[in-house]
Amino acid sequence: VDDLIATGSSLIEAVQALKKAKAKSIRAAISHGVLSGPALERLDKCKDLEELLITDSIALDNHKKHPRIKVLSIAELLGEAIKRIHNEESVSSLFD
């Protein structure tokens, strides 16, 4: 779990460390998929990463799509947060 993936180097290092520690399955969850520079090429070469979950907080261009990337929508969460802020209600309970 990380806040963002830019070039992917930190993610690849983490995957390699997990593989070295004999992890049976490796998946990653990243909040913001920047995916700049060599990120997709690195992801392509990193066969030990089974799945990369990212949110749609940053739209993925078609050329950044990858078979092991799954994009999760945060639209409902953001909408509910905006509604609660507007109604002066708590947003912290969204994350309990």
Language-model regions: role of each:
Residues 1-96:
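PRPP-associated nucleotide enzymes
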